[in-house]
Design a protein with these regions (language model features):
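Generic secretory/membrane-interface signal
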Residues: 1-9, 64, 75
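Bacterial Sec signal peptide processing site at the extreme N-terminus
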Residues: 3, 7-37
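Sequence contexts marking disulfide-bonded cysteines in secreted/extracellular proteins
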Residues: 10, 40-51, 100-102
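Secreted/processed peptides and extracellular or luminal domains of membrane proteins
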Residues: 15, 52-53, 107
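Surface-exposed patches in mature extracellular/periplasmic domains of secreted proteins
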Residues: 54-61, 136-140
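Mature extracellular/secreted ectodomains of secretory-pathway proteins
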Residues: 65-161
Length: 162
């Protein structure tokens, strides 16, 4: 997910199911598009593919609120549970698929914007590693992820205003 940050570049494609819905900032706060139309489409397609697996569905409902309007989000953000073995395995598999989209997300970015993305990837990978190692709870992981996404969004807006 790093995924959600990646999906901020998604184009407007009508999803066939809720798992295909990528989180996108509201138009009022959305930064200028990071990618050309063809890169944005390839990135969106990659994200949608990753969000359709059984592991992605389990992660979205039991571990990390990946999709927009997730009916499990409130419970996930307040969960004091640590990962069970099945959840840790699903998250690991989901991340392997989702992280395959990262090279596309970095295509054509300015060095400054690329650095923002890479910093986000490094930090979110740390959150996921702590979650899988059971150092933090599901709730803490969701909260940290949200804070990282907001921080990254603000950094991208700051770059845009330069």
């Amino acid at each position: 997910m790093g995924i959600v940050l990646l999906s901020g570049c998604a184009t407007n494609i009508t999803p066939n199911n809720p798992v295909q819905v990528a989180k996108v900032p509201s138009p009022m706060t959305a930064p200028a598009p990071d990618h050309s139309g063809s890169v944005a489409k390839r990135l969106n397609d990659c994200i949608i593919r990753g969000n359709q697996s059984a592991d992605a569905l389990l992660v979205d409902s039991q571990v990390i609120a990946v999709t927009r309007n997730n009916s499990h989000a409130k419970a996930l953000f307040s969960s004091a549970d640590k990962l069970k073995d099945e959840q840790a395995k699903a998250l690991t598999n989901y991340l392997a698929e989702a992280n395959s989209c990262r090279p596309i997300a970095l295509e054509g970015l300015s060095p400054e914007k690329k650095a923002v993305y890479e910093d986000f990837f490094k930090k979110i990978d740390g959150v996921y590693a702590d979650l899988i190692a059971r150092k933090i709870t599901i709730g803490v992981a969701n909260q940290e992820r949200q804070l990282l996404m907001q921080d990254t969004h603000m950094k991208k807006l700051a770059l845009q205003s330069k």
